[in-house]
Regions:
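Periplasmic N-terminal accessory/gating domains of Gram-negative outer-membrane beta-barrel systems
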Residues: 83, 93, 119-216, 227, ...
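C-terminal beta-signal and adjacent terminal beta-strands/loops
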Residues: 584, 625, 634-651, 670-674, ...
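Gram-negative outer-membrane beta-barrel transporters
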Residues: 453, 543, 561-644
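Membrane-embedded beta-barrel scaffold of Gram-negative outer-membrane proteins
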Residues: 358-362, 484, 517-584, 589
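Short, acidic, small-residue-rich periplasmic hinge/interaction motif at the N-terminus
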Residues: 20-26, 34-39, 44-49, 78-82, ...
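Surface-exposed extracellular loop regions of Gram-negative outer-membrane beta-barrel proteins
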Residues: 367, 415-424, 468-470, 474, ...
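Short, acidic Ser/Thr/Gly-rich low-complexity loop/linker segments typical of extracellular
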Residues: 51-62
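Transmembrane beta-barrel wall of Gram-negative outer-membrane proteins
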Residues: 242, 248-271, 285-320, 334-359, ...
Length: 726
């Protein structure tokens, strides 16, 4: 019987660049806020961007506050029924800055309706905006960006790790973009057996985290189902360091900005060491070697002009582990090792006062080693990408954007693989792997956003991509509309064609098959009600039709484009915020997903046809320093293919399993409860946060897979390694 497991994390924020012993003199910012007619605006918010320093205007429109922030800053003025205004200012230490501001009345522009607190953005259907603070506070998410996303409707965790499946699609149909670059392998332990994967993306390094589960715009290509669009911070606004210490990992990060504000840098380093965690939690899982991982990254930012910015993003990750796994013909350790390098150089500037031009150049390398019995492979994927985007308004009601990109990819695989899938012994027959494939993809898009009225917005675009390996091109038109019903509610609809070219792994064996680009057509209709971010309700229905999916031929390792399928479903989302104590949301998804994985067969349940998924997340502030939270998840079990019998193969001294209809079985219902608590305090005169989390409170034995004995006459459950942990 499992004993209660303990897991405690400590966050410590320390200044790497302390002030001098002399007290820094505070500066004063004051002034008045009026409307166009000269009347004072009461209750207007005045705040320094990126800080909590600010004030609110009184009945005479007057405001005044003190701040220790100095140098080049942006001050934001906003008020109900008025448009937001930003002012660039220079704040001198000990000085007084007087700012008298006039605010214009807001026009409630439909294309500018943005919900920022873990909700959705109109005009781009199914878009979820997350904040780093919310990500770190979600119980069970372990401060992981991708795990946090799975608490929203439309997405599911893959094997309780960080990889996600969206709206009945395959995880390979989800693509991450970082500052315009494609990020293909942002995970530690991504492909290991019964092991939770973790994201290499540091949410605190992101200024924009936007997740779209369908109906996304023409700027995104070569992806069928969903997009996670990340924007890293530009010039840091401060300097300091942040430390993290836990039972299983530790990390250190920091930011720096020079005095003139023209150079900045960030860094983050992390080390994953599971041995203390295993010993404290009395984990009986057998590891060889014990899981370890490292992650190192950062940015360098140069301000080249008033609007020009050059930013270099770097990230390196490494993981290594082995976990005990039993199969009918081999009982040993499944071992995997991964090395990943990602870098992106981006330059952006404003050619005019209202336009933006950006260009990025990125490179990534992903090296993987996998071994289990006779299987022993080493693969390496290289990606290079150049992309340019331009956006500008052409009139008061019309914005246009366009872009062009070229991406290079090569995939190499060496080693050996079993000839017979049912014989994995170390001395089993095998064939040698020694393959290399290269390809390129060129893409171009253009998009228009037109406001017919204050309540009606249309966004339409088209993109085209060309794949050099198969010499095939695609054209993808996309359209979305938003109509405001009332000040707080609107309806939205979207449709579009989406293509994704087959991965190079499908072209590795024998002659290059004539594979077509995979295609999905999205149809989305939704309703949303949002009252000042304190009450949000969203209901969205969708239908996706798949064609030209890569399918397996009954001839081993031959592939065709005969696959097809569909997904239909409904997503519901409800969020309630009761200031300042409570914040929580409920998400529900219904999915019906069918596909034809093999050539000529009927449609069956897809691998991620998870019919019902419900998540409930809550957070309660007991005081200004103490916060508790809880998450409850329940979902339909994943489909699987049962074994109904076996045939003995004397040449291999092994049994060949006889399978029932593909994905005709279901795992038991998945359920899990997670809780956490956070306490803010001072440690050695520095800001610190103590964080405790109890995952899988009821120690539910969620099924990972079934294993079978030598002749498949008996089976037993292999439960997930995500048992109860604190």
């Amino acid at each position: 019987m499992k004993i209660l497991l303990v897991f405690v994390i400590l966050f410590i924020s320390v200044s790497a660049f302390p002030q001098n012993d002399s007290v820094k003199k505070a500066s004063v910012v004051k002034g008045t806020v009026k409307n166009k007619t000269g009347k004072f605006v009461e209750g207007a918010n005045v705040v320094i961007e990126g800080t909590i320093d600010g004030s609110t205007t009184d009945e005479k429109g007057y405001y005044e506050f003190e701040t220790e922030k100095t140098g080049r800053r942006v001050i934001i003025f906003s008020a109900v029924d008025f448009g937001e205004r930003k002012m660039n200012v220079d704040i001198e230490e000990g000085g007084t800055l007087v700012l008298d501001v006039t605010l214009s009345g807001t026009e409630f522009k439909t294309d500018e309706i943005t919900v920022t607190a873990s909700s959705f953005t109109s005009g781009e259907n199914s878009r979820v905006t997350l904040t780093p603070l919310e990500i770190t506070r979600i119980p069970g998410a372990d401060a992981d960006l991708y795990r946090a996303i799975t608490t929203f409707s439309g997405s599911n965790q893959v094997d309780e790790g960080s990889r996600i499946a969206v709206r009945g699609g395959d995880p390979s149909e989800v693509l991450t973009f970082l500052d315009g670059a494609s990020l293909y392998n942002p995970f530690l332990f991504g492909d290991n057996y019964n092991t939770s994967s973790y994201s290499t993306v540091n949410p605190w390094g992101m200024k924009g985290i936007n997740f779209s589960s369908g109906g996304f715009s023409a700027k995104y290509g070569n992806v069928l189902s969903a997009v996670l669009d990340l924007q890293s911070y530009d010039m840091p606004q401060t300097k300091g360091m942040f430390a993290f210490i836990g039972l299983a990992n530790a990390g250190l990060s920091g930011v720096y900005r020079n005095k003139d504000g023209k150079f900045g840098a960030t860094f983050s380093a992390g080390q994953f060491f599971i041995k203390p965690f295993v010993e404290v939690n009395n984990d009986n899982t057998e590891f060889e070697p014990m899981p370890t991982a490292s992650n190192l990254g950062g940015t360098l930012v140069f301000k080249t002009s008033n609007t020009g910015l050059l930013k270099l993003y770097l990230n390196y990750s490494y993981d290594n582990m082995g976990i005990k796994s039993e199969s009918p013909t081999y009982n040993g350790f499944y071992s995997g090792r991964t090395k990943n390098i990602f870098t992106n150089l981006k330059y952006s500037f404003a050619p005019t006062d209202v336009s933006l031009l950006s260009t990025s150049v990125s490179f990534s390398s992903d090296n993987r080693t996998n071994k289990y019995g006779v299987l022993n492979t080493v693969s390496n994927s290289l990606y290079g990408k150049v992309r340019t985007d331009f956006a500008t308004p052409v009139s008061e009601n019309t914005d246009v954007s366009a872009g062009i990109e070229y991406e290079y990819n090569d995939f190499k695989e060496n080693g050996r693989a079993p000839v017979y899938f049912y014989n994995l012994r170390e001395n089993a027959p095998y064939y040698n792997l020694d393959f290399l494939r290269k390809t390129g993809r060129a893409g171009v898009y253009t998009e228009l956003r037109y406001k017919f009225s204050d309540d009606f917005l249309l966004q339409g675009g088209v993109r085209s991509d060309y794949y050099t390996l198969t010499e095939k091109a695609v054209v993808d038109p996309r359209l979305s509309v938003v109509y405001r019903i009332t000040r707080h509610s609107f309806v939205k609809a979207a449709t579009g064609i989406y293509h994704q070219f087959p991965a190079l792994i499908y072209f590795m064996r024998g002659n290059i098959p004539d594979l077509k680009p995979e295609q999905a057509v999205h149809y989305i209709l939704g309703y949303e009600y949002n009252r000042e971010n304190d009450f949000i309700f969203r209901l969205e229905s969708y239908y996706k039709r798949y064609t030209n999916l890569v399918s397996n031929s009954y001839n081993y390792y031959n592939y065709t484009s005969d696959g097809k399928g569909y997904v239909t479903g409904v997503d519901a989302f409800l969020k309630i915020r009761l200031k300042p104590k409570f914040n929580g949301w409920l998400s529900y998804s219904y999915v019906d997903s069918k596909r034809t994985p093999y050539e000529g067969m009927n449609e069956v349940s897809a691998d991620y046809d998870i019919t019902h998924t419900l998540s409930l997340v809550s957070e309660y502030n007991i005081s200004d320093y103490f916060t508790v939270g809880a998450t409850y998840k329940i979902s339909t079990g994943k489909p699987y293919t049962p074994v109904t019998g076996s045939i003995y193969d004397p040449s291999q001294n092994a049994y060949v399993p006889i399978y029932a209809e593909l994905n005709s079985g279901r795992y038991p219902v998945y359920t899990r409860i997670d809780v956490n608590a956070q306490y803010i305090f001072a440690l050695f005169g520095r800001f610190a946060v103590a964080f405790a989390a109890l995952n899988n409170v009821l120690n539910t034995k969620n099924l990972y897979e079934y294993n079978y004995n030598f002749d498949y006459s008996q089976k037993w459950s292999v439960n997930s390694t995500n048992f109860r942990t604190i």
